A protein has these predicted regions:
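N-terminal Sec signal peptide cleavage junction
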Residues: 1-2
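Extracytoplasmic small-molecule ligand-binding "clamshell" domains
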Residues: 6-11, 15-96
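Phosphate-binding glycine-rich loops and adjacent basic patches that engage nucleotide phosphates
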Residues: 23-33, 98, 113-118, 142-147
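Soluble periplasmic/extracytoplasmic beta-strand elements of cell-envelope proteins
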Residues: 36-38, 45-48, 76-78, 111, ...
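Short, solvent-exposed loop/turn elements at domain surfaces
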Residues: 44-49, 105, 151-152
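Short amphipathic alpha-helical segments
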Residues: 50-51, 109-110, 155-156
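Bilobed "Venus flytrap"/periplasmic-binding protein-like clamshell domains
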Residues: 56-69, 100-102, 119-176
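Acidic, polar ligand-binding/catalytic clefts
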Residues: 74-136
C-alpha cells in the first residue's frame, strides 16, 4: 500500500462577506464574481503547487481565499512567473500575492499591503568548500530569480565589482 501526503489549507468557509468592504471594490473586480490572483507557485510554503502539479496551495493562497470571501467573491489563483505578476495587476489579475519585497519602484506600479517580512540568504555547497564570502561575490557564479530584489542586489554588487576592477559576478537569472 502506498501512502500519500495531502495539503490541507485553512478552511475559509466560515468567513462571511462584509458588504461595507465589498462595496469599495470597482466593478472591474466584482463583475465576473471571481477574485483573480496571480502568484508564483514556486515559493513554498507561501505559494506552491499541490501533488497534482496543478492546484495552487500555501498560506498566501489561503489568504487570498479569505480576502475573496470577505469580498463575497470566488477565488482563482493563477500560476505565473514572479516577474510578470506586478505588471499584470489590473489587467490579467485583480491582485498579486507572491511574497514581494516592497520597493520604491514597485510602489510606483501597485499598492501594497504588508503582512509578512522575510530575509534573504545565500546557499552554498555543504561545508562551503569554495569559501564563498557573501560580502564579496566578485568572480563567483550566483543564481537568482528573475525580477526579484535579490537579482537587483546582485546586479548592484556586480557593478561595484566592475568599478573596483575585480572580476564580474557570473549572474545566472532564471524564472525558475
Amino acid at each position: 500500500a502506498s501512502s500519500s501526503t495531502s495539503i490541507q489549507g485553512f478552511d475559509t468557509s466560515s468567513i462571511q462577506k462584509d458588504d461595507e468592504i465589498a462595496a469599495l471594490l470597482p466593478d472591474s473586480v466584482t463583475s465576473d464574481g471571481t477574485l483573480t490572483v496571480g502568484a508564483d507557485t514556486s515559493y513554498a510554503p507561501a505559494e506552491f503547487l499541490a501533488e497534482d502539479g496543478k492546484t495552487p496551495v500555501g498560506f498566501d493562497v489561503d489568504l487570498s481565499k479569505a480576502i475573496a470571501a470577505v469580498f463575497g467573491l470566488k477565488e482563482e489563483t493563477i500560476s505565473s512567473t514572479f516577474d510578470s505578476i506586478i505588471p499584470s495587476v489590473g489587467s490579467k489579475y485583480d491582485l498579486g500575492i507572491s511574497s514581494f519585497t516592497v520597493t520604491k519602484e514597485r510602489m510606483q506600479a501597485v499598492d501594497f499591503v504588508t503582512y509578512f517580512k522575510a530575509g534573504s540568504t545565500y546557499v552554498v555547497q555543504k561545508g562551503n568548500p569554495n569559501k564563498v564570502d557573501s560580502s564579496n561575490l566578485c568572480g563567483v557564479k550566483v543564481a537568482v530569480q528573475t525580477g526579484t530584489t535579490q537579482e537587483e542586489e546582485v546586479n548592484k554588487a556586480n557593478e561595484q565589482c566592475k568599478a573596483d576592477g575585480k572580476d564580474a559576478i557570473d549572474i545566472q537569472s532564471s524564472k525558475l
